[in-house]
Amino acid sequence: MTIIRPAEMGDINEVYSLAADFATSFDVDRAAFNKTFGESLSEPNSYVAVAETQNRVGGYVLGFSHPAFYANGHVAWVEEIAVEESFRRQGVGRMLMSAFEEWATSRGARLVALATRRAASFYKEIGYEESALYFRKIMQGHDND
């Protein structure tokens, strides 16, 4: 049975492995990951949860809540979601997204948004609609290490 629970510092190695496997834009630097993981767990506007089966982490979601003028209140953004290959097609992604949506609702978020390259059909299946193009700019001194 898979459970979704808040991430803990003890999950750092398994979440790092998932993040490193799924990163498409950056190489995940271990020292930077460790710092960011700890910050994310303690940041009140962030949500980090893991999917666990038989004491093994097979997925995670990282997201944030913040105010937005256009939404007349708070919005929530899924920054990262990853599910290990052996955990796919078992509802784990849906469970992680559902848990994030519950958290977002509890924070007063009026919408949940995300960007994806790999799973557009999955998000459409769970009620998301395509809304905008996604642009990014790597800031000077912070290339994709």
Model-derived segments and their meaning:
Residues 2-3:
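Extreme N-terminal starter segment of soluble prokaryotic enzymes
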Residues 83, 89-102:
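Conserved acetyl-CoA-binding loop-helix of GNAT-fold acetyltransferases
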Residues 94, 106, 110-112, 116-137:
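Conserved active-site alpha-helix within GNAT-family acetyltransferase domains
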Residues 6-10, 17, 21-73, 79, ...:
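Acetyl-CoA-dependent GNAT
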Residues 11-14, 95:
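Charged catalytic carboxylate motif
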